Amino acid sequence: MKKIINFILGAFLALNLSASVAYAAAKEVRIAFFMEWATPNQEDKVKKAFDRAFGVPVKWTNFATGGEMTEAMLSGDIDISYSQGLTPFVNAVNAKAPIFLVDIAVLYGMGGTTCVVSNASGITKANASDLEGKKVAVPLGTMADYVFKETMRVVGADPSRMRVIDMNPEDGSAALVNGDVAMACLFGGKSIKKAEEAGSKMLTVAEAKDAGIAGIDITSVTNKFLKENPGMVKAFVEVTHEANARYNSGKSDMNVIAKDAAMDLAGTKKQMGGFEFPDASVMKKKYMNRSGILMTYLKVMGNMFATSENPALKNYGKVVTTKYLP
C-alpha cells in the first residue's frame, strides 16, 4: 500500500512539475505597447501583476507604430503585441506573417486617432479637396492610415493626389506645427494635443462616429510563442480583462496609469473616456463571432490594404481565436 501511495504521489508531483515547465517554457515574456495610449492594464504592468501571473519577468517595450511591433515580432524580439492596430495586423497577415489575434484590446472613436489640418492652410472639410497636391503626414500601415483614407472618402478628397509622407505621430505633429505639412493623421494623446496647437480636426469625434469611422486595437501573439506558451497567453488575457473590469467599475488607480502612459491625469481621463474595454462575453457574441464587427472590419481592411504581392485572405477567421478569452 505504501508503495502504491508513493507511486501516486510521485506521479502527481511529476505531472505538476511537467505542467509548470510547460506553462513557463519562456524565461521572459517580451510585450510591446504604446506610450500616450492609456489602458487599464498599465496599472498591472507597474504593480508586476503580469510577472506574478507568468512566473517569469516581463520586458515591456514601447513602439511608435503597430507596424514596428510586427517587425519586432517577426525578428523574434517581441512575443505579444498589446493594443496593436487592426490595420498593421491585417497588413502582417496579408503578408503571411506568423501571428495570431487572441483578444480585442481597445475600441475607440476618433478622439484617439484622427487627422488634424493646419489652420494656416485655410482648409476644412468644406474645401478638403484643396489638400490635393499638398504634403500630408501619415504613419502608413497603421490605424491612422485607415482613418486618413476613410476621412478623405467622407470629405470628398483624393488621397492619391496628395504628397503623403510616412511619419510617426510625434514627427507628424511637429511637422504640422512647423508648417511642413498641411495635415497630419496621428494617434496618441500628446501627439494630437501638439498638432492641435496649429490645427483642427478634419472631422469631429461625433462626425467621424456618424460616418462609421471607428478603431479597434487588438492583442496579437507570435505563432511560436502561442504554441510553446499557451498558458502564458491565457494568463496575459485574463489579467488584462481583470484590469478592464476594474476600470469599468471605477476602481482603477488612474494616477498610476497616467504616469506609466507618460500623460497628465486630466489627459488620461479624457482619452480613456473615449475608449471602450468590452468583456469577453461581448467580444464573443458581438465582435469575434463569424459575422461579428471585428471579422467585418478585418475583411474590409484586408481588401483596402491588399496588394498584388500580398492579397487579402479569403478567411480571416483562420488568424483569430477566442480560445484564450476568460
What are these regions (language model features)?
Residues 1-9:
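Bacterial N-terminal signal peptides that target proteins for export
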Residues 298-326:
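Conserved C-terminal helix/tail region of periplasmic/extracytoplasmic solute-binding proteins
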Residues 165, 171-260:
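Pocket-lining segment of extracytoplasmic ligand-binding domains
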Residues 18-25:
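Sec/Tat signal peptide C-region and signal peptidase I cleavage site
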Residues 227-308:
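Secondary-structure end/capping motifs
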Residues 25-155, 163-166, 182, 186-189, ...:
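Short, glycine-/small- and polar/acidic-enriched structural segments
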